[in-house]
A protein has these predicted regions:
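Face-selective signature of the C-terminal outer-membrane beta-barrel domain
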Residues: 1-91, 168-170
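Outer-membrane beta-barrel signature, preferentially recognizing the C-terminal barrel domain
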Residues: 91-108, 112-114, 118-170
Length: 170
């Protein structure tokens, strides 16, 4: 029995479907959709529900020594009645979902040598616990933040991968 008033229970439902098609011209398309639903009953952060729905597509193309990958994901998230709002390069979009893009390329100028570059966006909607937890342990108090906003970010990379061959060891 939990007598600290910190009990919680949750139901989580998840589904995902992915489809991939390879074409003769060295093109591969991958697409899919996912959904999740969470129902939480908690003494720490109250009773809440969340919905996450996403659709995505990615293309991979190969030409001799050059490979390119580009992808896009559309992310919808809602906790109770607060839902995601689209934003692109710090510009608010009038859509209820968040577009997320990624791009990558590799080039093999010589055997065992690879140059690579990539760019990707990141997006994370706050969890139910992050928005609504309320707790105290001794002098430490944790307060809810129902106005907590999603996190947006990006990453980029340039790199060189150099392999070596010594006799039959690669």
């Amino acid at each position: 029995k939990n007598n600290t008033n910190q009990g919680a229970s949750s139901d989580y439902y998840f589904s995902e479907y992915q489809f991939q098609k390879r074409f003769d011209n060295k093109l591969t398309l991958t697409s899919g959709a996912m959904s999740s639903y969470t129902l939480v009953k908690s003494q720490l952060y109250g009773d809440h529900n969340s919905t996450n729905i996403a659709g995505y597509i990615q293309g991979d193309k190969k030409w001799n020594k050059f490979n390119i990958t580009a992808g896009m994901r559309m992310e919808y998230f809602k906790i109770d009645s607060v839902q995601s709002k689209g934003k692109l390069f710090n510009t608010d979009l009038n859509i209820p979902f968040q577009p997320v893009f990624r791009f990558g390329a590799t080039y093999q100028p010589m055997e065992y040598t690879f140059l690579r570059a990539s760019y990707g966006q990141g997006y994370r909607f706050p969890s139910i616990a992050e928005k609504y937890i309320s707790s105290a342990v001794g002098p430490l108090n944790v307060f809810p933040n129902p106005n907590l906003e999603p996190e947006y970010g990006w990453s980029a990379e340039l790199g060189l991968k150099q392999g070596f061959k010594i006799k039959n060891f690669k």
